[in-house]
Curated annotation (Swiss-Prot):
Residues reported to bind ATP: 19, 171-173, 239-242, 250, 256-257, 273, 277, 281
Catalytic activity: L-methionine + ATP + H2O = S-adenosyl-L-methionine + phosphate + diphosphate
The protein's name: S-adenosylmethionine synthase 3
Residues the record lists as binding L-methionine: 60, 103, 250, 281
Triggers of expression: By salt stress, in stems and leaves (at protein level). Follow a circadian regulation with higher levels in the light.
Gene3D superfamilies assigned: 3.30.300.10
Protein's organism: Atriplex nummularia
Length: 396
């Protein structure tokens, strides 16, 4: 490629499952999973906050399920690796507070008529606007900067849990800067410019050992060699010390990592968080169907890059607006693609829940609560399934 091409730098970050905000996301979604597993009609809005030696779950839940909230909190913390005060939280001995009430009857009658409505009549649980995004720069049709930052975070956890790097502790953050060029609206990654990893560690390890292990066991297996060169910059634990972490280091709250959960700063975001919300909450289900729409457009070859916006009013099933922009990469005009999207996707919340099988609990939502909701290769991530679009391909 000619060196004269104008390039730019774009950065995405991620945090791994031991970050206090992500711990809260996972607890909120573990509660949602437990409710849906017993009662698929559960209405859940579960928030979590944490600080040293304390976790609190609070919100509105209406369910027939019999759920032991404290047990779920402790189990989720334990599974992440918070098993002693040294690492930032002791799952078995921390204080757990629960303040959960029923969903407001005013909201209930407006959204689902106290469970009397058919799925296609269920109204949106709130107002709001959501975005879905897709780009052809990676096989998962996600931005490379975001994919790499996310995979580095997941790999950090993997080498901690499998004993490869026994000095690791649960909390950690990653950030990747990619050099791109703009090919008529499509994003083409050229190289990785900077890799930043800050990970919690124990007292026994030196900064040199940390840097060597991170390069060998985390960066090398994750970032394809073709993107690294002698100019790539590495910042590995640049603060010099990160022993205190998890809720001991920082307070955590559900819904504070919404860009990490989505597209790493690419596309756009309507502001609504995902975790702890059942599918009548369009913050979540709307964003999931918008991703499926955008991904299906790019996968069908209709565009190289695409964003879809939808918006809702509380109690109203049909979206108020649907918007599509292909950044000039569309094979046909955007207004034609918009028509295809409207014919191919049912954006009513009750139908999204059925078509994407969103009423299923288990560990379904817990899995989404760390390492991103999109671009994941897992059958439970039903919104990642490419949907055949209803359109007449122009004859060659």
């Amino acid at each position: 490629m000619a060196a004269a091409v104008d390039t730019f730098l774009f950065t995405s970050e991620s945090v791994n499952e031991g970050h206090p905000d992500k711990l809260c996301d996972q607890i909120s979604d573990a509660v949602l999973d437990a409710c849906l597993a017993q009662d698929p009609e559960s209405k859940v809005a579960c928030e979590t906050c944490t600080k040293t030696n304390l976790v609190m779950v609070f919100g509105e839940i209406t369910t027939k399920a019999n759920v032991d909230y404290e047990k779920i909190v402790r189990q989720t913390c334990r599974d992440i690796g918070f098993v002693s005060a040294d690492v930032g939280l002791d799952a078995d001995n921390c204080k757990v507070l629960v303040n959960i009430e029923q969903q407001s009857p005013d909201i209930a009658q407006g959204v689902h008529g106290h469970l009397t409505r058919r799925p296609e009549e269920i109204g949106a649980g709130d107002q709001g606007h959501m975005f879905g995004y897709a780009t052809d720069e990676t096989p998962e049709l996600m931005p490379l900067s975001h994919v790499l930052a996310t995979k580095l975070g997941a790999r950090l956890t993997e080498v901690r849990k499998n004993g490869t790097c026994p000095w690791l502790r649960p909390d950690g953050k990653t950030q990747v800067t990619v050099e791109y060029y703009n090919e008529n609206g499509a994003m083409v990654p050229i190289r990785v410019h900077t890799v930043l990893i800050s990970t919690q560690h124990d007292e026994t390890v030196t900064n040199d050992e940390i840097a060597a292990d991170l390069k060998e066991h985390v960066i090398k297996p994750v970032i394809p060699e073709k993107y690294l060169d002698e100019k790539t910059i590495f910042h590995l634990n640049p603060s010099g010390r990160f022993v205190i972490g998890g809720p001991h280091g920082d307070a955590g709250l559900t819904g504070r990592k919404i860009i990490i959960d989505t597209y790493g700063g690419w596309g756009a975001h309507g502001g609504g968080a995902f975790s702890g919300k059942d599918p009548t909450k369009v913050d979540r289900s709307g964003a999931y169907i918008a991703r499926q729409a955008a991904k299906s457009i790019v996968a069908a070859g209709l565009a190289r890059r695409c964003i879809v916006q939808i918006s809702y009013a509380i109690g109203v099933p049909e979206p108020l607006s649907v918007f599509v922009d292909t950044y000039g990469t569309g094979k046909i005009p955007d207004k034609e693609i918009l028509k295809i999207v409207k014919e191919s996707f049912d954006f009513r919340p009750g139908m999204i829940a059925i078509n994407l099988d969103l009423l299923k609990g288990g560990s379904r939502y817990l899995k989404t609560a760390a390492y991103g909701h999109f671009g994941r290769d897992d059958a439970d991530f039903t919104w990642e399934t490419v949907k055949p679009l209803k359109w007449e391909k122009p004859q060659a």
